[in-house]
Amino acid sequence: MSEPLSRWKTLALVSTALVVASCPLHVAREALRKPAEKGALEAEARFVGRARCAKCHEKETKAFTGSNHDHSMAEATPEMVRGDFGDGTREVTFEGDGLRARFFRRDGKYLVETEGPDGKYAEYEVAYTFGWKPLQQYLVRFPGGRLQALPVAWDTEAKRWFFLYPGQRIPPGDWLHWTRNGQNWNGMCAQCHSTNLVKGYDAPKDAYTTTWSEIDVSCEACHGPGSRHAAWAEVPPMGRPKTPNAGLVQKTSGIGSRELVELCAPCHARRAELGPWKHDGAALLDSHLPTLLDEGLYHPDGQILDEVFEYGSFLQSKMYRMGVRCTDCHDPHTAKRL
């Protein structure tokens, strides 16, 4: 036997021996990992936050950062407040439809003086911004854990303050007055501007203890609670179990037009909530009741008349009938048109 051939045979034998020897070690290591991983994969899915998602999904996280969803709600800071509250020495006044509002800053806080629940004018501190563009609203804390949306919003394109109900005088005590239930964040708006929101309404006390896992519309608002997926992803690729949808509760790919449109519909439709929204992949009508083509909401031909968002009119369109889905025109992470 020639010396080169002998060397190759020896090398092959040594390599085979190393592979065979390493197999038990790999199996043993995986066996030690499995109990914890199995528990995480079988436990009820819980929300883990975008930082956990970003470890593997850097591209999607970068696209999402700075989007309308990312800025759907935030603490009132100089980076997030887009409205003109003056500069500490200058005040800004809005007046119209029987309402007056004075916007100003003091001690680093954003303040507004306007009509209160009793009809008297008082100062209120802005706690949160609400929305990013084309308008931004502002939330004020009230007793009972309530957050109320001011009636004057900032037009980010025209750069001006405007009244949300032009031509109407909404008196104190009216359901639509900004201090009443029609403009209550907890019950009317919160569900679609934060992730894993729990209203926490206590009927006997008529008070809220509202919580969220992330203040804005983050990854799990659309993908569902991600603990099982994160546990699955942390297993070495060759040892990952065959888990449906990689452990995610909500399927977002490989689904039909109706399923994908219904994924967006809870927050892009005028609808009523039938109960807690569990982000569990259930059909839309199991958790929400979309508004029908009621008079005053739509034009006779089905076009949008009032604030009905997108779902109701899109459902009537030729595009929907032909299988067009939201993500055919909109990037789901940047929320921009493609």
PLM segments and residue spans:
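N-terminal Sec-pathway targeting helices
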Residues: 3-15
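Hydrophobic membrane-insertion alpha-helices, especially the h-region
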Residues: 12-26
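Primarily the internal scaffold of c-type cytochrome electron-transfer domains
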Residues: 30-37, 44, 51, 59-131, ...
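Long, basic N-terminal domains or extensions that often function
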Residues: 188-193
